[in-house]
């Protein structure tokens, strides 16, 4: 069996992985001005960097919003498109080794996919994600560079901008510890520092995603949430999601290659869809 290439094609960023003998090899990401340039650039670079010949590639599996722009096989290699939500679930399950979970795909917005064995269902989403973080940062901090915003946030203090339970109550409320957020940005002042604003923006996005994922699990017995997508790489995830775990009695997991899970899932879909 040759190499199966999984490609997650975004509007400007493409993520690509290879799958051979059940193992993920050398994931990379490429950013370009448009999805076609990004896709072909990523594919060419992947083959070049890993010394892979065209005849070693058995199949290319595409997913993501940018895949709609692709109308033919990639460089003459057999190419198939697969559903993005299915790819999210397959990749998250493969990397986390968790069979029953809500897959939280944190992209420009955020989608929720229930994965229970081979039963995969898209159960909803919210318009909060990386696009929100970039847009608010552009307005409030004059930058949309997520790495820069994250670095600023590491120097900030969320207590300077967010209202906590301890600010409005002399004792914890039922199920709510003193450090739980009562209102996001409710304490922000006109002279709030860039660092505190950055901390507030990131906390708002991650807390909202975390709380929404818990609501998505309401009425089910699912207590595991697998976080995938670029935002899962933010160092603030390691601070915010453990607090939400205690608050809601759930478990958040960030697997290896969390940024590439959708591309991995696309490659895995080759066998699931009976193409092999």
Model segments located where?
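Glycine-rich phosphate-binding loop plus the immediately following alpha-helix
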Residues: 118-173
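Glycine-rich phosphate-binding loops at beta-strand->alpha-helix junctions
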Residues: 62-68, 215-244, 259
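Conserved phosphate-binding/catalytic loops in two-lobed NTP-binding clefts
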Residues: 78-85, 242-264
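Short beta-strand-loop/turn "lid" adjacent to the catalytic site in phosphate-handling enzymes
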Residues: 29-32, 43, 48-84, 94-95, ...
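Short glycine-rich, Thr/Ser-proximal phosphate-binding strand/loop in the N-terminal lobe
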Residues: 3-41, 120
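Conserved phosphate-binding catalytic cores of ATP/NTP-utilizing and phosphoryl-transfer enzymes
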Residues: 70, 75-104, 109-119, 264-272
